[in-house]
């Protein structure tokens, strides 16, 4: 039940190089196939190369069309896309930048917006993330990360909820997907 989760869909913790961007594709496809509704998937990254990589994976898997306009060029275009109920939007967290000292405006009160945040441990604890949550107060959020913030604060879990999938470095080495890493001090 989405209401009980308070917009926290969870943390998808898979080690680097394990295919998190394809997991985003599978997640979006499954939601569209299994749950009725007119969902908007907002895919957030913090680097242009990641934004392009994830967008290309959605194109290659034919979830979206090659020429579909879904990567806003600036904050204004992002706001326009959100208000026109596009199915998929790929953008940088930086497009939620706003004048210092001013409150970010609400862009949509829809509860069928699902925000997929790539590398959530890097961007989700400061002003830009707070602006995004102010802009989309009823959205549902899921984190994709290879490095969740752990320890006593467990910030990633506080912002996104419990783990929905875990595949850590040790599991990847054991499965043969990752070569083990050894360090030898020589100084």
Positions of PLM-derived features:
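RecA-like P-loop NTPase motor core of helicase/translocase proteins
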Residues: 1-187
């Amino acid at each position: 039940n989405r209401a009980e989760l308070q917009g926290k869909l969870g943390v998808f913790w898979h080690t680097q190089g394990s295919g998190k961007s394809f997991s985003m594709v599978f997640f979006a496809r499954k939601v569209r196939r299994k749950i009725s509704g007119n969902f908007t998937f907002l895919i957030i990254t913090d680097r242009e190369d990641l934004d392009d990589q994830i967008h290309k994976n959605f194109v290659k898997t034919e979830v979206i069309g090659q020429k579909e306009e879904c990567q806003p060029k600036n904050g204004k275009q992002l706001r326009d896309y959100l208000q026109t109920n596009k199915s998929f939007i790929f953008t940088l967290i930086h497009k939620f930048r706003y004048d210092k000292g001013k409150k970010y405006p609400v862009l949509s009160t829809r509860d069928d917006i699902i925000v997929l945040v790539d590398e959530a441990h890097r961007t989700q604890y400061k002003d830009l993330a707070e602006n995004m949550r102010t802009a989309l107060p009823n959205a549902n959020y899921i984190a994709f990360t290879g490095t969740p913030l752990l320890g006593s604060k467990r910030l990633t879990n506080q912002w996104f909820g419990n783990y929905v999938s875990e595949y850590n470095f040790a599991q990847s080495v054991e499965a043969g997907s990752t070569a083990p890493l050894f360090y030898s001090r020589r100084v």
